[in-house]
Swiss-Prot record:
It comes from Rhodothermus marinus (strain ATCC 43812 / DSM 4252 / R-10) (Rhodothermus obamensis). Residues 153-455 form the GH26 domain. The gene is manA. Gene3D superfamilies: Galactose-binding domain-like, Glycosidases. InterPro entries: CBM6, Galactose-bd-like_sf, GH26_dom, Glyco_hydro_26, Glycoside_hydrolase_SF, Secre_tail. This is Mannan endo-1,4-beta-mannosidase. The lineage of its organism: Bacteria, Pseudomonadati, Rhodothermota, Rhodothermia, Rhodothermales. Residues 17-137 form the CBM6 domain.
């Protein structure tokens, strides 16, 4: 057996790491030079058995790396297996060309220090491995403007502070259980980490009239939450709104009055109620909103701005306010906004909308939303939540702050921020989710230089919101070819920073005839090819990358 360990040592700024296959540890494979077009002294082949592999040892600076293989194989597909330290991935590579070519299997995150890699390519040849550093920039900041033009000075200051920290720090947040007389979640975090969350989310659930009608006990009150906030703590409020009427009381369906916010435990029809403003059920909607307004008024009187997150997770359909589809939901959201802001004069609210995947049509509109959140309950405690972040950046990047408004796990902040994932804040759901988080992970995150805890908050009330209009920072370097083209369109764009990329094609009437959302892409050259079944004519190709945009004319021929 050939045995050769290679250690690559890098210092300073992360550079490309190149591992020549023939310099690795060869297990059941051999160096060959029969084929042409390889680099170095040869390539490695003979991956015939499952245990055959080439292994490397190397050192790397901390960061995100794109993994690229120089390979060759004769079949259309070749199966591979890659292990880097404890991380493992399998898949198939698609043949391109007749000799050696480069194939990428995506990105990995490496901590600073020593690493090991093992690679298998069944019935193929490995020339080299490249680890190409990828740098992600911060998210684009939205305009410094709240939806409520009469927002209180403290609400404006809090929003200005959140804007200033977006892409620099993530605020540590925690959901508090409303059924404990003590602040058990906050106390647990303090006991484990020695710190308190900068932001705590409380629930107005038991102030719903159909819960109070059953004599519900208020274990915590807005006065308690105001006392916790003091002058510097940040308050978020949600509302599990028990349906205004028509609750199902049926133990055989596991339905009781206290489950009245679930679609399955009420027959209340929000669409019908909204359609008839003279109906009793519409009046009950207003009654409930007015009751909650009285509780929110306490925060305004105490000069406590509120990150107000009502009607959450509507597109999931499991709550009655989302049971009838997007249009009644948006109508209810706007009614709630108008009633609280303009009827009750509540100007201390920063409105937080909770987005669900693939539910863009549920968005109430920029005029009614200040921040967009996402509630994520991942099975994997190490989940990066990249797809959630990328979707939100594609839809709202440069328009709205984005927050992880609920999470059942706690992502490793050092890792996700290297991927350019900078939530405005995270909020861990209460037990059992909070106690399921590894205490070491909780402590590391709370002590991270990329996270702000309560003791690290500045005097955010001194921040000033300067309304601005975000303008494109410049043109993108965009190329489209062949031009003219017969159905196949190639797009190449140089991305100065990581950004969500959207490709659109418009006809001369201004109608969009094609759209492709690529999600968040790293800085550098980005290219795609598209098969377009378009009539002959002149089209406009537009590429948006965050708040950058470029357009080119393209001619389609047969």
């Amino acid at each position: 057996m050939t045995l050769l360990l290679v250690w690559l040592i890098f210092t300073g700024v992360a550079g490309e790491i190149r591992l020549e296959a023939e310099d690795g540890e060869l297990l059941g494979v051999a160096v060959d030079s029969t084929l042409t077009g390889y680099s170095g002294r040869g390539y490695v082949t003979g991956f015939d058995a499952p245990e055959d592999s080439v292994r490397f040892s190397f050192e790397a600076p901390r960061g995100v790396y794109r993994v690229v293989f120089g390979v060759s194989f004769s079949s259309r597909f070749a199966s591979y297996a890659l292990r880097v330290d404890d991380w493992h991935q399998t898949g198939s590579l698609i043949k391109r060309g007749g000799g050696f070519f480069e194939a990428s299997i995506g990105e990995i995150w490496l901590d600073e220090g020593a690493h090991t890699m093992a690679f298998q390519l069944m019935n193929g040849a490995l020339d080299y491995v490249r680890l190409e550093p990828v740098s992600y920039g911060p998210p684009a900041r939205p305009p410094a403007q709240l939806s409520d033009s009469q927002a209180t000075a403290s609400a404006q200051a809090l929003f200005a502070f959140l804007l200033s920290e977006y892409g620099r720090h993530i605020l540590a947040g925690q959901q508090q259980n409303p059924y404990r007389r003590d602040f058990d979640a906050i106390n647990y975090v303090r006991n484990v980490t020695g710190k308190e969350p900068a932001l705590v989310s409380f629930d107005l659930i038991d102030y719903s009239p159909t819960r109070e009608a059953h004599g519900v006990v208020h274990y915590q009150t807005p006065e308690d939450w105001i006392a916790w906030a003091g002058r510097d703590g940040i308050v978020s409020l949600m509302w599990h709104w028990n349906a205004p009427t028509d609750l199902i009381e049926d133990p055989s369906q596991d339905c009781y009055w206290w489950y009245g916010f679930y679609t399955r435990c009420t027959t209340f029809d929000v669409a019908a109620a909204l359609a008839d403003t003279s109906s009793e059920r519409y009046r009950l909607l207003l009654r409930d909103i007015d009751v909650i307004a009285a509780q929110l008024q306490k925060f305004q009187q105490a000069d406590i701005p509120v990150l107000w997150r009502p009607l959450h997770e509507a597109a999931g359909g499991w709550f009655w306010w989302g049971a009838k589809g997007p249009e009644p939901f948006k109508q209810l959201w706007r009614l709630l906004y108008e009633r609280l802001v303009h009827h009750h004069g509540l100007h201390n609210l920063i409105w937080v909308y909770t987005h669900e995947p693939g539910a863009a049509e549920w968005y109430p509109g920029d005029a009614y939303v200040d921040i967009v959140g996402r509630d994520v309950y991942a099975d994997d405690p190490d989940a990066l939540m990249r797809s959630d972040w990328n979707e939100l950046q594609t839809l709202f990047g440069g328009r709205k702050l984005v927050a992880l408004t609920e999470t059942g796990t706690l992502p490793d902040v050092e890792v996700i921020t290297d991927y350019g994932i900078w939530w405005s804040w995270f909020s861990i759901w209460t037990d059992p989710f909070l106690r399921d988080v590894d205490p070491d992970r909780l402590t590391r995150v709370y002590h991270s230089e990329r996270v702000l805890t309560r003791d690290e908050l500045p005097d955010w009330r001194s921040y000033v919101l300067h309304a601005t209009t975000v303008q494109p920072a410049g043109d993108l370097a965009l190329a489209v070819y062949p031009n003219p083209g017969a159905g196949r369109l190639h797009v190449e764009v140089g991305l100065p920073v990581a950004a969500p990329v959207v490709v659109e094609v418009f006809n001369l009437l201004g109608q969009r005839v094609f759209q492709y959302q690529a999600g968040m892409q790293p800085a550098g050259l980005w290219r795609r090819a598209f098969e377009l079944a378009l009539a002959p004519g002149v089209y406009l190709v537009q590429v948006r990358a965050g708040n950058l945009v470029a357009r080119r004319r393209w001619v389609s021929v047969r």
